[in-house]
């Protein structure tokens, strides 16, 4: 199981500092949406320059202009980009085709999907490399969205990542679903000792 840490605050220097501390305990560094909004592709470039051997994931939430957007983030050093499931199939397919030509992978964000099962079923044929099931950030901290897990996992052979405001309190419930990856943010990035917290989750995930 992969561990992905999301940096989703506007302070790029602080994000890079924390990333350096947790680097031994993470498989993928995510440049979060707010970091991208604030700094643009420079945030992706900064992470790639600081951690050239790490997988860099840009949570850019592409919904239009797929070819241009993917190219922009690929040139900045992203290894993964996100495309929204609720956008048109043409946008998803174009994004995936462009990504493949640039050696970049696409994770389909199911947040705005009209039908989770249908999105999961069609994703592979559109060129998607993985799926993202997560709890919207503004919703209350519950794991009720995990009730939809079987609907997604049962309709795809692609890897599925879970992002759920993961903490020590709920990590076991998330792990019990056996996702291919977990995405963790503020419980590590806001911790007094980010490295210690990252190590805790990394060692837990390594058992699955």
Regions found by a protein language model. Give the residues of each.
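Active-site/ligand-binding-proximal alpha/beta "capping" segment
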Residues: 129-199, 204
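Generic secondary-structure signature for well-ordered alpha-helical cores
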Residues: 24-27, 49-52, 79, 100, ...
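Well-formed, non-transmembrane alpha-helical positions, independent of function
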Residues: 21, 46, 72, 122, ...
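Conserved N-terminal beta1-alpha1 strand-loop-helix module at the mouth
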Residues: 1-67, 75, 126, 168, ...
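Hydrophobic faces of well-ordered beta-strands that scaffold small-molecule active sites
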Residues: 3-7, 29-31, 56-60, 81-83, ...
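Alpha-helix-loop-beta-strand connector modules within alpha/beta enzyme cores
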Residues: 37-60, 94-112, 145-168, 199-208
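Conserved anion-binding
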Residues: 3, 65-68, 72-157
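Short, ordered loop/turn segments at secondary-structure junctions
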Residues: 10, 34, 61-62, 85-88, ...
